[in-house]
Curated annotation (Swiss-Prot):
Belongs to the AHA1 family. Gene3D superfamilies: 3.30.530.20, Activator of Hsp90 ATPase Aha1, N-terminal domain. One of its GO terms (biological process) is protein folding. One of its GO terms (molecular function) is protein-folding chaperone binding. The lineage of its organism: Eukaryota, Metazoa, Chordata, Craniata, Vertebrata. GO terms for cellular component: cytosol. It comes from Homo sapiens. This is Putative activator of 90 kDa heat shock protein ATPase homolog 2. SMART domains: Aha1_N. Pfam families: Aha1_N, AHSA1. The gene is AHSA2P. Co-chaperone that stimulates HSP90 ATPase activity. SUPFAM superfamilies: Activator of Hsp90 ATPase, Aha1, Bet v1-like. Keywords: Chaperone, Stress response.
Length: 299
């Protein structure tokens, strides 16, 4: 069992500066943000839709905000991505020859939604052109979602070249990580594979909490001191959740004046949102603060 500040080094973390493979635990993480932006330009700009009434084309990648990363741990790949994308489109109504242009927005491309459920909104500048707008909204949206699906395939194949890929032997075992703060312990156990659970609607949970300690010490509570004090991405589940249902949790550690701000983002079932807020606040954050009051800053 691990005490606070002596956690298991197997958590997925952003990067070790010395590149050491801790305890021969084969993990790595790659930033796919810049590569993703190039892929969006390649896949989305140039999309054309056409029918007897008009022709539309996505001609500009106006804005891309967000990040993406690929993590590998013990032969398992985990992907984290969150994007807000804005595209410019133009078109022409064939009968009148009138040209129109507008905007396509994808406000939340992330693990929270499947590609087919990802919101794609379309707008058009003032003027008549309902036929063209309808064309872009139907056929155009379908092609945009198809391109987003191609991006996710690339994220999981092209962007992972050189990383440790799952092997047939490793695929027979799932690693279940359970965080138990009540006893200030961390348990890691392997379990046999079971059938995949049914897909359930999810929601993004955002929380921020201030702790009267340094980034280094707060970070060490979730992992080990020798790892970079910045960000942790991990799969997490409650013991009473259905098998194979996990939440993806991202923890960012931001230094403030005399304190550390912990920014938490978690994708989980919609019906679990309020319970998880209570769980993080009461069973995790408050216990950590209580532990910090008994622990000197220098450890």
């Amino acid at each position: 069992m691990a005490k606070w500040g002596q956690g298991n080094p197997h958590w997925i973390v952003e990067e070790r500066e010395d590149g050491t493979n801790v305890n021969n635990w084969r993990w790595t993480e790659r930033d796919a943000t810049s590569l993703s932006k190039g892929k969006f330009q390649e896949l989305l700009v140039g999309i054309v839709v056409e029918n007897d009434a008009g022709r539309g084309e996505i001609n500009e990648l106006k804005q891309v905000e967000g990040e993406a990363s690929c993590s590998s741990r013990k032969g398992k790949l985990i992907f984290f991505y969150e994007w807000n994308i804005k595209l410019g489109w133009k078109g022409i109504v064939k009968e009148s020859g009138v040209k129109h242009k507008g905007l396509i927005e994808i406000p939340n491309l992330s693990e929270e939604n499947e590609v087919d459920d990802t919101e794609v909104s379309l707008s058009k500048k003032k003027g008549d052109g309902v036929i063209l707008k309808d064309l872009m909204k139907t056929a155009g949206t379908a092609k945009v979602r198809e391109a987003l699906g191609d991006y996710l395939k690339a994220l999981k194949t092209e962007f992972t070249t050189g990383m440790i890929l799952p092997t047939k032997a490793m695929a027979t075992q799932e690693l279940t990580v359970k965080r138990k703060l009540s006893g200030n312990t961390l348990q890691v156990q392997a379990s046999s594979p079971v059938a995949l659970g049914v897909r359930i609607p999810t929601v993004a949970l955002h929380m921020m909490e201030l702790f009267d300690t340094t980034v280094e010490q707060l970070y060490s509570i979730f992992t080990v001191k020798e790892l970079t004090n910045k960000k942790i991405i991990m799969k997490w589940r409650c013991g009473n959740w259905p098998e194979e249902h996990y939440a993806m949790v991202a923890l960012n550690f931001v230094p403030t004046l005399g304190q550390t701000e912990l920014q938490l983002k978690e994708f989980l079932s919609i019906c679990k949102e309020e319970n998880m807020k209570f769980c993080w606040q009461k069973q995790h954050f408050e216990e950590i603060k209580g532990s910090l009051q008994l622990t000197p800053l220098n450890g």
